[in-house]
UniProtKB/Swiss-Prot annotation:
UniProt entry keywords in alphabetical sequence: Host-virus interaction, Nucleus, Ubl conjugation pathway
Protein name: SKP1-like protein 20
CDD domains: BTB_POZ_SKP1
Source organism of the structure: Oryza sativa subsp. japonica (Rice)
Assembly: Part of a SCF (SKP1-CUL1-F-box protein) E3 ubiquitin-protein ligase complex. Interacts with rice black streaked dwarf virus RBSDV protein P7-2. Is able to form the SCF complex together with CUL1 and the viral P7-2 protein. Interacts with D3.
MF terms in GO: cullin family protein binding
UniProt GO BP: jasmonic acid mediated signaling pathway; protein ubiquitination; SCF-dependent proteasomal ubiquitin-dependent protein catabolic process
Amino acid sequence: MAAEAETKAMITLRSCEGQVFEVAEAVAMESQTIRHMIEDKCADTGIPLPNVSAKILSKVIEYCSKHVEARGGAAAAADGDAPAPAAVEANKAVEDELKTFDAEFVKVDQSTLFDLILAANYLNIKGLLDLTCQTVADMIKGKTPEEIRKTFNIKNDFTPEEEEEVRRENQWAFE
C-alpha cells in the first residue's frame, strides 16, 4: 500500500515559459536537483525551472520516465519467482531496450542536443548528461579541426601563424 501511494505522488514542474508539467515523484527524483528540493520540502507549490524550456523539459521527462519504467521492470523480473537465468535474460532485454531508446533519444538537432546537455547539467541527471556528452564526443571523434569547425559552425579566429604555433606546441596530439 505504501509503495502504491509513493508511485501516485505527483510533482509539479514549471518551465521557464511557465508551462506546467505534472510528473510522478519517482520520475522527478531522477534529477538530483529536484530530489534535494523535494527532500527539503521546497516542492509543495511546484518547482520552477527557469533554465529549462518546455520543449527541453518534456524531452527530459520522457528520458527520465523511460529509465524509471525500465528499472521498475528489471526490479519486477528480479523479485519474481523466476529462476535466476530468466531474471538475467529479462535484465538483458531491459538493458537492450534502454540502449535502443537512448540511441533514438539523442537523434535530435544540435541545438536541442546542446539544450539537453545544459538541462541535464542544471538538473543534475548524470545518465542524461553522460549520454548527451558522449553523443557530442562521438560527433567530434576522428575529425580534423576544420571538420569540427564545420560541424559545429565555429569560426576560426586563429591566424595561420597562431594555428601553426598551437600545432607545434601540441605536436604530441597529432602523432
